[in-house]
């Protein structure tokens, strides 16, 4: 069985060693053929707490780590730059 991989954006980093990654899946509607976007949120394991909100990451499927965590951060593709003005 091949491991699944997804690319998404970190939308929450408030938990310890866990981030929430939003993955956008685009597909044609079965009847109307219009392109529809569906956002799925995955809780992913981040052991070093290295991800921040807005980072673009690649996640991979893993064994169940908790009740809701079945994904782990494989690599950070794009880091976001935080300014001092954003904290105000």
Curated annotation (Swiss-Prot):
Keywords carried by this UniProt record: Ribonucleoprotein, Ribosomal protein, RNA-binding, rRNA-binding
Keyword rRNA-binding attached: yes
UniProt keyword Membrane present: no
SUPFAM superfamilies the UniProt entry points to: Nucleic acid-binding proteins (SSF50249)
Gene Ontology cellular component annotations, sorted alphabetically: cytosolic small ribosomal subunit
Record note on quaternary structure: Part of the 30S ribosomal subunit.
Protein name: Small ribosomal subunit protein uS17
Organism: Prochlorococcus marinus (strain MIT 9515)
């Amino acid at each position: 069985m091949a491991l699944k991989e997804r690319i998404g954006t970190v939308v929450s980093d408030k938990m310890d060693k866990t981030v929430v990654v939003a993955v956008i899946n685009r597909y044609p509607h079965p009847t109307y053929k219009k392109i529809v976007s569906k956002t799925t949120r995955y809780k992913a394991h981040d052991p070093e707490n290295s991800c921040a909100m807005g980072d673009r990451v690649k996640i991979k499927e893993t064994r169940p780590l908790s009740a809701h965590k079945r994904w782990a951060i494989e690599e950070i593709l794009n880091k976001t730059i935080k300014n001092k003005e954003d904290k105000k």
